[in-house]
């Protein structure tokens, strides 16, 4: 079986020199024969577990060129490997340290701990505003001395909480944390989460508005996690809601595809994507393109002193969707699963070839069998080439998972206020 891709008589490959460049040029003239044999055996085994060999894709590439390939240029259902494109588009649009800002304002004066007006929350498309953030927000409002809101809780802009994109429901979730309903169980829950004296009462209902009303004072600015940390959380747990929020903030799937293709140096027609999460077999990528997307991510984050391991789960360190996998240690990966699809892509760190980018796309019915074979293939390749020891620093996580306080207390009375 020919494992080096040829399209229209031209041999193609993804340039990953130093892991930095992308695009298509001639690969190494001598693909690794052992890798070719291992891939051939892998394809035969996964075909026995699912669909025939034409429904499986493999691409292995080092900085020197293509090492082995099967159906590498054929778009196949990518499942959550679609999130690799979403990740790249987000990094291209905003940069790895970008923060999404949620503002909390007041429409009236605050006197003796009482806001005589509405509390206004202006969402900024933060995809990871969760209950813990709401609790910290309540603490910040308490630090301002705010104890009671006589008006409503007004939701403006793109405010999401606990992964729901419904602004009304997000507002209700926020109010439930800031000002729990007067039920005994709720009061007990509230006292458990907040020290005595930090309770906040909001008298009015939640109201969602299209345009932010005039406000009198800016109270708190809540900053999201840095984008690279948001993407890490999305990819470790393959969070579909976060992926769709990112895609919406980018302007929708077509714009996401344009940004990802631009950053990776590949044509847009190689990204057959209808959403940002990968839900649906209509989302299709070739194994070759997925490797180009991964390499572009590595290139984009390096100027910020980050690595691709700060963006995706790392075997032996992270859990999430790889908690039951048997991958070579320090392998940086993204998993993908649909009802009849199991995919895996990322980079293994080898002694012989350095970083080797890979993408494996499998279709059929035996998902656990596919995963077992995927893990075994990577273990075989690392055994053949040797594991990088120590692993290169450019592929090791640099940033801790832990969070820091991200609320800025503003207390700024706007012009015309009192």
Label each PLM-derived region with a short phrase.
Residues 18-75, 138-143:
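Beta-lactamase-like hydrolase cores
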Residues 35, 69, 250-418:
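Small-residue-rich helix-loop
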Residues 53-55, 73, 79-82, 97-99, ...:
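Extracytoplasmic
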Residues 57-61, 85, 118-122, 152-156, ...:
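Soluble periplasmic/extracytoplasmic beta-strand elements of cell-envelope proteins
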Residues 78-96, 153, 234, 358:
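Active-site SXXK
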Residues 92-107, 304-309:
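Short, well-structured active-site flanking segments
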Residues 103-161, 167-169:
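Active-site-adjacent, His/Asp/Glu-enriched structural segments that form or flank metal-binding
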Residues 149, 159-311:
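A small/polar active-site loop signature that marks catalytic segments
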